[in-house]
Curated annotation (Swiss-Prot):
Annotated protein name in UniProt: Bifunctional protein HldE
Disulfide-bonded cysteines: none
NCBIfam families for this protein: cyt_tran_rel, PRK11316.1, rfaE_dom_I, rfaE_dom_II
Gene: hldE
GO BP of this protein: ADP-L-glycero-beta-D-manno-heptose biosynthetic process
Enzyme Commission identifier(s): 2.7.1.167, 2.7.7.70
CDD domains: RfaE_like
Lineage of source species: Bacteria, Pseudomonadati, Pseudomonadota, Gammaproteobacteria, Vibrionales
Length: 476
């Protein structure tokens, strides 16, 4: 059975660890330097992304979760860039700025998709006062349901045992992405997520599945761990828990471009899923699906709920369900090439009712494929006012995707879907209500491309607003 995505807006996660800024310079290489036998890169584009523990926080935020991050930085420009980028993503930053250290920064120079060199600007944080982080943890722990300790061996987790005990005393599970071969320092953690090389550095070479399981359980006992998740690259993942059978997950990656940040994605999706109420095995299945997405991207990357839903339930390959705009455009082209008539409609669909279902069934009967474009939460709020939507974008899309009449569900953030419709160009655009075809957003573009626009009637007596008022009034 495929796992169901939880409501990540309920997931509060505290991240403590080594924060860093990843910088990228891109450009073509057309000649060799006369000064040394190295290529000359003409830098045409630059990019800055939060990395390390900060990338974990970004992953939590991209899922719609509430991320609170504690880390060590310098008092410098990269620290400001890092804080501004995270804050813009609604990550709560609680950095300890130390004057004698630089903020860890990694600069990568790339040309034609290939990394030519990486330059590191860093000094390991040493002999820091544990209380600087412990006091911040104490304030944050009552607001979260999971803690991630993200260790890149840069010094932020110098006092990691104290951090583990602080979280455990508060009754909050601790998930750790380990670094190095000294797992004694992680004693008592709820879950460790070593990759295969990190695992073998501690237990020795593993020659079989049985040996992996035996050595994994021995590790759990030795270091008093709650569970162990070994990420195994092309062999997927193996989850080991006390008193339970091993849980193996095959890899879901189709193409691997870059493994940078994949471990961050695994632990962030896993912890956020547990914080949102998922059992550990389901959370691991979701993390495995997310890893399959992120290794297909270049550089440190995040996974959105749309991409995660696609990976879990299918869209590009299975050709149905929640889908991204780019994937939808591709799917529509393929469908139209097969001679299928594609119908498209849009709306908020905040509380799905009988009128919506009747309308969508009617729309589906007019063609071979039905697309439903859904206003995002911010778009609904602008259109409907405070208190709306009642249901989040992900929930509304999940319900629509479950209807037999609907083939694809795609979000849009603007007030109208005109841009999206112009990009998709369905054969038939339909809209419910009292409209003139020429006044429907996207209608002119569809007609200009040879398509049609049609207005359908809504079922009388069905209204989301009336349902909300009835609930407020206590009527059934």
């Amino acid at each position: 059975m495929k796992p169901v995505l939880p409501d990540y807006s309920k997931a509060g996660v505290l991240i403590v660890g080594d924060v860093m800024l990843d910088r990228y310079w891109y450009g073509p290489t057309g000649r060799i330097s006369p000064e040394a036998p190295v290529p000359v890169v003409k830098v045409e584009q630059s990019e800055e992304r939060p990395g390390g523990a900060a990338n974990v926080a970004m992953n939590i935020a991209s899922l719609g979760g509430h991320a609170h991050i504690i880390g060590l930085t310098g008092q410098d420009e990269p620290a400001n860039v890092l804080a501004n980028k995270l804050t813009s993503l609604k990550v709560h930053c609680d950095f300890v700025a130390l004057p004698d250290y630089p903020t860890i920064t990694k600069l990568r120079v790339l040309s034609r998709g290939q990394q030519l060199i990486r330059l590191d600007f860093e000094d390991k944080f040493e002999n820091t006062d544990a209380q600087l982080i412990l006091s911040r943890m104490e304030s944050a722990l009552p607001k979260v349901r999971a803690v991630i300790l993200s260790d890149y061996a840069k010094g932020a987790l110098e006092h990691v045992q104290q951090f583990i005990q602080k979280a455990k005393a508060a009754g909050v599970p601790v998930f750790i992405d380990p670094k190095g071969s000294d797992f004694e320092r992680y004693r008592g953690a709820s879950l460790l997520t070593p990759n295969m090389s990190e695992f073998e550095a501690v237990v020795g070479k593993v020659k079989s599945e049985q040996e992996l399981v035996e050595k994994g359980f021995a590790l759990i006992e030795k270091f008093d761990l709650g569970a162990l998740l070994v990420t195994r690259s092309e062999h997927g993942m193996t989850l080991l828990r006390r008193g339970l059978e091993p849980f193996h997950l095959p890899t879901q990656a189709k193409e691997v471009y870059d493994v940078t940040g994949a471990g961050d994605t695994v632990i962030s999706v896993l912890a956020a899923s547990v914080a949102a109420g998922k059992a550990l095995d389901e959370a691991c299945a979701l993390a495995n699906a997310a890893a399959g997405v992120v290794v297909g991207k270049l550089g440190t990357s995040t996974v959105s709920t749309i991409e995660l839903a696609e990976a879990v339930h299918g869209s590009k390959d299975t050709d149905y369900g929640v889908i991204s705009e780019d994937a939808l455009i591709e799917a529509v082209k393929k469908a139209q090439a097969r001679g299928e008539k594609v119908v498209m409609t849009n709306g908020c669909f905040d509380i799905l009712h009988a009128g919506h279902v009747s309308y969508l069934n009617h729309a589906a009967e007019l063609g071979d494929r039905l697309i439903v474009a859904v206003n995002t939460d911010e778009s609904v709020k602008r259109l409907k006012g405070p208190g709306r939507p009642v249901n989040s974008t992900d929930r509304r899309m999940a319900v629509l995707a479950g209807l037999g009449a609907v083939d694809w569900v795609v979000p849009f953030s603007e007030d109208t879907p005109q841009r999206l419709i112009a990009a998709v160009l369905p054969n038939l655009l339909v809209k419910g209500g009292d409209y003139k075809p020429e006044d429907i957003a996207g209608g002119k573009e569809v007609i200009a491309a040879g398509g049609e626009v049609k207005v359908l009637n809504f079922e009388e007596g069905c209204s989301t607003t009336e349902i909300i008022e009835a609930i407020k009034g206590g009527r059934g």
